[in-house]
């Protein structure tokens, strides 16, 4: 988020996230294909590939989530993952959003799609951010909804052993405009600052009385 103070005049600023996610690409692009029919077939083939990948991700995600009969089924969070190793991709929700954006773009004409590309329009985020998976060992402690500091447990017991808790955190980048103010803000009229903001997610924690349980804790989720 961009914190601004005491403006001398109204200014409208739009920011756009700068997260990057793994995706699939065809060889070449639509402009190198042999005409409208080939372009349509290329889009259809790529859409089928995306659908196949998303279906596989959904199947894997269902294996991680508790069953409906489990009383902890509602504890699942898109930014928290239980895994035996570091996740190799962003949360499924982010991938699905990227997939939806792809489908929206596929329905545009080539000319409209080129002009709608943020890179072609010279758009930049108001604040630069970075995202990564972190472990409970790196977080160690967090603040819960009551304002108390709790210990974030590194491992969660499951029927076949233990899994580690991973948190997908997004924070302001240490480089760029984080310290100099928000990009696009006129320094003559505004004082601005890029600041990391937090949200609550469910995690397995332990309080100062050694009571273990699932609690909402704060983690960094945006800039």
UniProtKB/Swiss-Prot annotation:
Endpoints of the signal sequence: 1-5
Pfam families (alphabetical): NGF
Source species, domain of life: Eukaryota
Glycan-carrying positions: 107
UniProt GO cellular component terms: axon; dendrite; extracellular space; synaptic vesicle
InterPro entries linked to this entry: Brain-der_neurotrophic_factor, Cystine-knot_cytokine, Nerve_growth_factor-like, Nerve_growth_factor-rel, Nerve_growth_factor_CS
Maturation propeptide residues: 6-114
Disulfide bond annotation, renumbered to this chain: 127-194, 172-223
UniProt-annotated location(s): Secreted
GO biological process: cell surface receptor protein tyrosine kinase signaling pathway; modulation of chemical synaptic transmission; negative regulation of neuron apoptotic process; nerve development; nerve growth factor signaling pathway; neuron projection morphogenesis
Single GO molecular function: growth factor activity
UniProt keyword terms in alphabetical order: Cleavage on pair of basic residues, Disulfide bond, Glycoprotein, Growth factor, Secreted, Signal
Role this protein plays: Promotes the survival of neuronal populations that are all located either in the central nervous system or directly connected to it.
Protein family (similarity comment): Belongs to the NGF-beta family.
The protein's name: Neurotrophic factor BDNF precursor form
Organism from which the protein derives: Eryx colubrinus colubrinus
The organism's taxonomic lineage, starting at the top: Eukaryota, Metazoa, Chordata, Craniata, Vertebrata
């Amino acid at each position: 988020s961009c914190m601004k103070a005491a403006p001398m005049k109204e200014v409208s600023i739009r920011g756009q996230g700068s997260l990057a996610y793994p995706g699939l690409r065809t060889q070449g692009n639509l402009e190198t294909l042999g005409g409208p029919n080939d372009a349509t077939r290329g889009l259809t083939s790529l859409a089928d590939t995306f659908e196949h990948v998303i279906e596989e991700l959904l199947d894997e995600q269902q294996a991680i989530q508790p069953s409906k009969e489990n009383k902890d089924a509602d504890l699942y969070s898109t930014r928290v993952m239980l895994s035996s190793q570091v996740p190799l991709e962003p949360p499924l929700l982010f991938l699905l959003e990227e997939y939806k954006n792809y489908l929206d773009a596929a329905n545009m004409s080539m000319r409209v799609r080129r002009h709608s590309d943020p890179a072609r329009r010279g758009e930049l985020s108001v604040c630069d951010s970075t995202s990564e998976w972190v472990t409970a060992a790196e977080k160690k402690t967090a603040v819960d909804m009551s304002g108390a500091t709790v210990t974030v447990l590194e491992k969660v017991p499951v029927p076949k052993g233990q899994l580690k808790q991973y948190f997908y955190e997004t924070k302001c980048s240490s480089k760029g405009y984080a310290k100099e103010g928000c990009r696009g803000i006129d320094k003559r009229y505004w004082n601005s600052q890029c600041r990391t903001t937090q949200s609550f997610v469910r995690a397995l924690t332990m309080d100062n009385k050694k009571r273990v349980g699932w609690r909402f804790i704060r983690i960094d989720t945006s800039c």
